[in-house]
Amino acid sequence: MADHDLDVSGYQCPLPVLKAARKMRSLASGDVLRLLATDPAASIDVAHFCAEQGHELLSEEQIDGALLFTIRKGLAEP
């Protein structure tokens, strides 16, 4: 398992989730993605994306006006 970072700061909905989805497709099951976003809507969008795609949202933190999501890739995408 590996950790990966993706900075989508400055992008507005739906681009943060679209970029996260593209990155997740390149990861192995169990890998972790740290996603940094500045769009407040990402809080809702990322949680929904994880639930729909079978990924685990490990944490959501606010850091210096940004949102940092930690996501573990699920075993299989629907």
Report residues per predicted region.
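Right-handed parallel beta-helix/beta-solenoid
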Residues: 1-7
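Amphipathic, hydrophobic secondary-structure cores in small proteins
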Residues: 8-60
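Short acidic/glycine-enriched loop/turn segments that link adjacent beta-strands
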Residues: 64-66
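Core SAM-dependent methyltransferase catalytic element
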Residues: 68-78
